[in-house]
Structures are given as C-alpha cells and as structure tokens.
Amino acid sequence: MTKKNLPLNFLLDKILKRLIQVTIALLATLLIFVGSFPSLAAETTTIPLTEEQWQQGEEMAQKAIEASQKGDFPQAEAYWTQLIDEFPTNPALWSNRGNVRVSQNKLDEAIADYNQAIKLAPDHPDPYLNRGTALEGKGMYQEAIADYNQVLAINPEDAMAYNNRGNAQAGEGNWQQALQDYQKATELAPNFAFASANAALTLYQLGESERALQKIRNLVRKYPLFPDMRAALTAILWTKGQQGEAESNWVAAVGMDYRYQDLDWVRNIRRWPPAMVAALDNFLKLKL
C-alpha cells in the first residue's frame, strides 16, 4: 500500500500533484505494496484566507505529513482533525485524515472521511481511489471495484486505479481480469514496479510459470533491493529444484523484509495469489 496527501494550499484552488507517502507500515496496511493507492485533488471555491491563517494551516499540514512519515499516525490524525475543525469544507483535509485512519486500521472511520471528501468534490477521482483502498481492507471487493471504475471514468489513464482494481479483482478470484488490469497499469506507467510484480505473481497463479519466472527475474535484475520479488523467486526456484539459487535469494529477501517468513502476512496482508503462497509454504516447510 502508499497514500497521497495534499498540502493545505489546496484551499487556494490549485490542482496539486498527488503526494505519495512511502512508509513500510502504510504499505503493509494498504495491502499491496502498491496494491491500493489513495489520494485527492480538486478545484474548490473557498473563503479568502488571511496570510496568517494560510501560514498556520500550511505549518499544521506539514506537521501532519511529517508525523505520518515517522509512523506516528495518531498524531497525524489529530493534526488533520484540527485543520478540519478550522476548514470543514476542504475535501483534501477529509481525505488526508482518512488516509491516516486507514494506516491505523480505522477503516469505517476512514470511509466516512472519504464519503465527506466525495460529497465536497464529487467530480475528482482521488477520493474514490482512497475509499476503494479502505473498502478492499474490509474485503468489500465489488464495492472497491466500483470506486476504481469511477476513477477510470474520470481519468482513463490512472495507472494506480488499474493496479488497485487488479488487486480487488484478485480478491474476487478473477485472475484473468486482474492480470489485464496490472498489465494496463504497467503500460501506462512502465516503471510502476509493484504493478509489474503483481502481474508476475498473477501469471504464476494462471499456470504460466515460465513467463512468471522470466518476469520476476527481470524485476530482480532491475530492482535488486525488491524483497517481494526476491521472495517470489525463491519460491519458484525451489519448486524447480534449484535450491542453491533459491536459498541465496531467500537470504536477500528476509534480510530486507523479515515478514516474508510469515505466511499469514504474505497471504492476508501482501495478498499473494494462492499458488504463490503454496510455493512459498513448500519452501518454508522443507527449510524448517
């Protein structure tokens, strides 16, 4: 998972680029290592602010972002709440608070925040993307797909929405549709590494193990510090009897991210496809 927060100068009617916060805790909560991304940006009419109000708001928004980057999500939530109390008609603030609530697994409260952001900015794609992520966290995949469809109706070239919809399709067991979405995401954003990773894992689930292996090898070469693909390469190589190479990739994978030793995390948080989970399980059982 990653999230995107907008600075407070959203209040000045600027359409701002999505700002991705990358933290390990946030990615894990969002299921996807790039599985499901939220964000927000839209035009709005606001009451003119004094220079002092603008400065105070900017400072508090920056504190909220810094708190999130440090993993202090309760403090970040408190900052966004203060800003909402001051500027309740700003949809970005509601969406940003929803993001940090997702990070604390407060999914229902996050969805309520995204609902308010959508009410205030119904024609902007980002709050739908955010809400889709939270819905995925609750296992409400069809509802998440509907939100991602709305994003794509507004912006047909949103690579994150395709990746996220692929995750939701995978949650429903629609592996072919998931693959198509992941591939579209990588077509739109060739350097979207996690979408490429999701496509590779899905190929394995669909029985195309050689294509999956080739794609995973390519990703490991391009991104040698990518533990997800190191762990996947370990699992596939082990099933092919290439124990030595499997072991060396495993040492690298767990050295970067120990969570791959936890099948429950791999299955339910990272959400690898069942065939990949089974391959890793086979490796771990024999290893232990």
Q: How would you name each of these model-derived features?
A:
Residues E43-E52, E245-L288:
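Terminal, low-structured helical/coil segments at or just beyond the last alpha-helical repeat
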